[in-house]
Design a protein with these regions (language model features):
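Short hydrophobic targeting helices and cationic amphipathic motifs
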Residues: 3-6, 16, 20, 24
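Intrinsically disordered, low-complexity sequence elements enriched in Ser/Thr/Gly/Pro
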Residues: 13-14, 42
Length: 210
């Protein structure tokens, strides 16, 4: 028993030295909520500025078109990760912000009735955006309760892969007319994409300041 305890203590100290047990600390979860809100604020600011420039032209997009836009963005991120260089100016960070915002667009489109007007005023758009990000924050808190800060042990490239996996699931669900037998539906997958993209932005922000 003493040997087991000693081994566990040794592993614990080794992990702490590599900052690998950070996710177990309650203070870390508070930090995550703060970081989530900061990243969400950046996404919201861009979202509303584009709404001011273009209105709600995105309302014309059918669900599959939004999914394809998300897929293209995620594929570009993976391509840059694998090649290590990029030739187009748009940064990886901007693509992750795009993943957040397009996923919110998808959730808004799923929520609005078919007879909703194409043109929505900025105030209404801001209200809908805030509602969905708050729901994602609640989802994050619930998952952090169960999993701790395990996402902090993930590589950003793994988050990219999980986003692509979610998008492939969404494409299949859409091809099945939105029906699933035992799996999560469209909303749950879009919400997971938002949170993984936010996590990636947090990790990238931290690496840029180290």
């Amino acid at each position: 028993m003493n040997l087991l305890f000693s081994a566990a203590l040794t592993i614990s100290k080794a992990c702490q030295a590599q900052n690998q047990l950070f996710y177990l600390c309650p203070a870390s979860m508070e930090k995550t909520l703060e970081q989530f809100r900061l990243v969400a604020g950046r996404c919201r600011d861009l979202f509303l500025k584009k709404t001011a420039d273009y209105g709600t032209a995105w309302r014309i997009l059918r669900p599959a078109s939004i999914t394809d836009q998300l897929y293209i963005k995620a594929l570009r991120i993976r391509s840059i990760e694998e090649k290590g260089v990029q030739k187009v100016a748009d940064s990886v960070e901007s693509e992750f912000i795009g993943l957040v915002n397009y996923s919110v667009l998808a959730l808004i489109q799923l929520e609005l009735p078919e007879d909703a007007p194409l043109d929505l005023d900025t105030g209404r758009v801001a209200e809908l955006f805030d509602q969905h990000l708050e729901e994602n924050l609640r989802l994050l808190q619930s998952k952090n309760h169960d999993y701790g800060e395990a996402w902090r042990l993930m590589r950003v490239s793994s988050m990219t892969d999980l986003i692509l996996q979610k998008l492939l699931r969404i494409k299949q669900i859409e091809d099945n007319a939105g029906q699933t037998l035992v799996s999560e539906g469209l909303e749950a997958n879009f919400r997971d994409i938002i949170n993984y993209a936010v996590f990636a932005l947090i990790r990238l922000g931290e690496s840029n300041t180290e």
